[in-house]
């Protein structure tokens, strides 16, 4: 066969996977239908449990130097109270980053090529080549329309939630939940930030954080039921949300929107069976969730790491282990994401716990670490830790 692996999709799951396989001695072909550098719809945010992988791969300094500001703190504004914390480090890395995808993906592609992978952009995969029930290659065409066939021991779909590869192999979906939000964002100048800010309200979430070129991304998330009025007047819908946040609104009024609005609507939640005879899936192709918790790139990096390890091992047992490890790592965040995306009111005891965190910086930092992936939700919400938080709050009130 021509290649050990063909990776279809060259963004934040596919390029790191191709890089790691090439570093492991594999002959790898990486293809993507897009031309690069190019942007794509994205939540942008990489939690520190994702940036730690960039460090491990030797890429964190390059992403830093691209102009994406580091963030070590997150500010959660619930209206009645505010919690601001610094998530604990993940393997020594505390910072989160939110690079523009045209910049990040180009860095990842360049490193894959430098590691030995072959890369073809503007290459459209049309079908898979099968032999005796096993995937053995791809058929597609390049930018000039020339039809090309390439063969490999394994074909990996890293081509997003609507993965063509997943469709062609009929990868089984499970634990599915429909999309329940609409998320729109754009970029503003004149709004300097050095933290990620979230404003959580009953029927909307506003998020703002710095990205490349001195710009700040502002995103608005609404329940899907609000889609039609929101889509009919995006500018008005954003400013209506800002009006409910007076201090933030004043800062936005002094800033300037520099680009059009981008949107993600009713993004589905699902797991897919991530491997079979001659094929595998990585990133959003194998596991997808609502963008409200901004876990996509962190999960894509994780999949690249775990799947590369499994493919380099080469055994069916290693691929089965990849699925189990992916699912175990995703389980708590998946449930948390679905709950937040439902916009269902939190139970009173949950809000009481958050309110009790006020003034307890150590526990605020640990709570912020749940989203960041550096603190276990099970440990934070254990009966022992909850009792400690409530007792500390009661003691502070008496004092």
Regions found by a protein language model. Give the residues of each.
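Glycine-rich FAD pyrophosphate-binding loop
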Residues: 8, 22-42
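Conserved N-terminal glycine-rich FAD pyrophosphate-binding loop of Rossmann-like flavoproteins
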Residues: 35-55
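FAD/FMN-dependent oxidoreductases across multiple families
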Residues: 66, 229-311, 316-321
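Beta1/beta-strand and adjacent pyrophosphate-binding region of the FAD-binding site
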Residues: 1-13
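A conserved beta-strand/loop capping segment in the N-terminal third of enzymes
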Residues: 55-106
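Predominantly flavin-linked oxidoreductase catalytic cores and closely associated redox partners
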Residues: 111-248
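C-terminal helical "tail/cap" subdomain of flavin- and related membrane-associated enzymes
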Residues: 309-399
